[in-house]
Amino acid sequence: MAEEAINPLRRRMIEDMTIRNFDQRTQQTYLRSVRSCCGYCKRRPEELTIEDVRRFQLHLGQCGLSPSSVNGAMVALRFFFRVTLRRPDAMDYIPIVRAPQRLPVVLSRSEVSRLLEATPSLKWRTALSVAYGAGLRASEVVGLKVSDIDSERMRIRVEQGKGRRDRDALLSPHLLKILRDWWKMTRPPVWLFPNRLNAFDHVTPKSLNRAFHDALGRAGIRKAVCLHTLRHCFATHLLEQNVDIRTIQVLLGHRKLETTAVYTHIAGKALKGIASPLDLLQLRPPPG
């Protein structure tokens, strides 16, 4: 968006998103999508037409973007037209791409063991153990504070996870031991995984992702997987342990409108007595 031309409109869009409690990351993503569309169509935001959006959508697809990435841009533009420009009619003309349903690739238990054992840094091995052992997203792992580990109730407090919802995640006995070993060695003051250059800030998802892929290479695992795969592994391995699917949805923080109340009721008792799949791994102690 051209700053001098669209400043008032940009401000209005930001206000529209703020009123609806969009987080900063979502706001930046929405603004970037509108700016990209304007740049491609060589128009100011208030001049955009439905035909411009259609051309932009085709352009994104031809550039090789995934359906989910294209849809993300279209959702942002839908919001811009419907809310900020007050043109709800535009919704009918900005379609959402139908994405193919693909099953996520998961690692076997032995592959997860190899991956963790191939992580030489105690910090990253602990962080990856949390990602798998509690089924957390990368942003949730790096954003953990020491105070989020509740050893009395055997839960990990996840604040403002995806969808800006707080939840409790599974803290198994073995994961607690791993976390205690890490804490005793480093005594982090606030963040569980502090930044090496600034102990009062946490590591980034990008750094954790790099550690994951480094370990993947060392372990000789050639599957097309990413850091989020550990979360898929957590859910899949629990299913293989015959844990009820509704319980798993609670542990992951997933939300379905028709079953939200059920998940809330079973979450309290579900967190006690469940063995994390991490507990079943036969891990060698870290070097040093």
Predicted feature residues:
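Conserved catalytic core of the tyrosine transesterase superfamily
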Residues: 1-288
